[in-house]
Amino acid sequence: MNYNFKNGNFDLFHPLIVVVMTILFLIIAMPMWYFYRELPTPNLDLYLYIGLGLLFFIFGICLSNCILKKNFKIDTVLSFKKILSAEKLSLFDNYSKNELILVGLVSLGILLQIINIALLGGIPLFSATLKAKAATKIWLISYIIFLPSINVLLAKYNRKSHYLLLLIGLVLFALTGYRTTPIAIMLSALITLYYTRDVDVKYIILAILAIAVVLLAVGFIAVQAISWQHWSLNPIELVSYRAAFTLNVLSKAIENQFTTMGNLFYTTLTGFFTHSDARVLVGQATIGRVHSITSTIFGPALLDFGIVGMLIQMFLIGLILKTLHSIQNHSKSIFTAFYGILLAQTIIWIETGPTDVVVWLFYLIGIFLIIHFLRGANHEI
């Protein structure tokens, strides 16, 4: 049966998916709390703070809808029937100048990642020592170039050969041993294609399953490569354990609000260039050890600025995501590409937290795109 998710105006990647994924993250953690008893169960405050954060995220979405409708006459619930897929191109069709530039940028990102792995002298996925050294300046530049370029390329040009570039980049970034980069590549590309192609449900399901497999495989292999850690959990149990542990760290962040007083956000923005890790500060502030750990999307803001800072952060994320979502429903191209990137990275933040300077850079670009569109906007979508 050829059923398409877009029929009936069902929007799979609406910003509200962040709420759904956060609840799913909680559910994944529960076996380790209530059945395996591997970790201490959280108190009520954890659920309260998560609920408040998600509520303000929804407030941001609602405000975006109001502003776009009232001030810019933009229909924020655009019918998917108005969506047009990019024109199909064969391998031998003429390449425009812009397409060649994008292919060149994607290829440059791939080349830089190959150079990065070659300079490391091995594959970081299979070596904890190499993985600790893999996030070099070359790696950062390659990721900043590759992720936006491949998504814009997929959004603008419907040429099957571009999927090969996507696959090559995905494999190379997976070999660094980090889960977040290959997941961001796969998820952002899926979101971009969802809004620019007529995607059959079976391919969406296959893509989601592939993302889950990559998440399990990269995470499990990377953990097994750490010689000083010994795990008896299988890959699925390990995911549940990590979710429960991360949420327990959030509980500690709730208890230790204002501990870092803005230093965590400052380190996030500058740490890559000063060789300091914001997640180590999270470890020091929550468990009292010099250890790099994650604290969910809510934790860092709580440690820096307390509950008010966390609520403002969630409100702004909801506002930005929904505004870009509404704009990309109309204009596609680069707007869809960056919506895919920001939504994918925000979903990843549900576990890791906003402690990556590159994601804040993408958010800054997203804000500039919104301003650029709205300055010339008086549209009726």
Feature-to-residue mapping (PLM):
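Cytoplasmic juxtamembrane regions at transmembrane-helix boundaries
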Residues: 76-91, 164, 169-184, 271-284
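Small-residue-enriched transmembrane helix-hairpin modules in multi-pass membrane proteins
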Residues: 127-132, 213-322
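Hydrophobic alpha-helical segments involved in membrane association or supramolecular assembly
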Residues: 148-152, 180-181, 188, 192-196, ...
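Membrane-anchoring hydrophobic segments
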Residues: 1-164, 199-203, 217, 312-313, ...
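Hydrophobic alpha-helical segments of polytopic membrane proteins
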Residues: 80, 157-230, 320
